[in-house]
From Swiss-Prot:
GO terms, biological process: fatty acid biosynthetic process; lipid A biosynthetic process
Cellular compartment(s): Cytoplasm
Catalytic machinery residues: 47
Protein name: 3-hydroxyacyl-[acyl-carrier-protein] dehydratase FabZ
Main function: Involved in unsaturated fatty acids biosynthesis. Catalyzes the dehydration of short chain beta-hydroxyacyl-ACPs and long chain saturated and unsaturated beta-hydroxyacyl-ACPs.
GO molecular function: (3R)-hydroxyacyl-[acyl-carrier-protein] dehydratase activity
NCBIfam families: fabZ, PRK00006.1
Enzyme class, broadest EC rank: lyase
Coiled-coil portions: none
Chief location bin: cytoplasm
Natural source organism: Thioalkalivibrio sulfidiphilus (strain HL-EbGR7)
Catalytic activity: a (3R)-hydroxyacyl-[ACP] = a (2E)-enoyl-[ACP] + H2O
Gene3D superfamilies xrefs: Hotdog Thioesterase
Entries under InterPro entries matching the protein: FabA_FabZ, FabZ, HotDog_dom_sf
Amino acid sequence: MSIHQVMRYLPHRYPFLLVDRVTDFKPGEYLEAIKNVSINEPYFQGHFPIRPVMPGVLIMEALAQATGLLAFKTEEARNENQDKQQLYLFVGIDEARFRRQVEPGDQLHLRVELLRVVRGIWRFKAEARVNGDLVASATLMCAGKEIES
């Protein structure tokens, strides 16, 4: 999925859209995406000027956005909620771990796997890698919410 397709599903926009491209997915199973980390990201002005590092919470947010995309594509494949305007909200995080810093010039590879959906709560295994090395992981949860026009 190109950035244009990503933007059809996610409501996020600059500076908070943290998925640049979806490289692979299988509805109901997994989604892989990338985030190109540029020195031009606004958060690098203050985190940290001497040695810029992507904040861990933004790595988790990028993974959360990937979970929303997988939820949308899964519902779409099941032909569910087609006539509703839906938004997936980040509702939980467990076992978050940060193993390495992410710096300008890195390409963050995101992978989320659907574990289960119980009472409207989607649970995912989430990992972020740079050059094949694990930089962050967590179990993330999201929930769908119908948007009223």
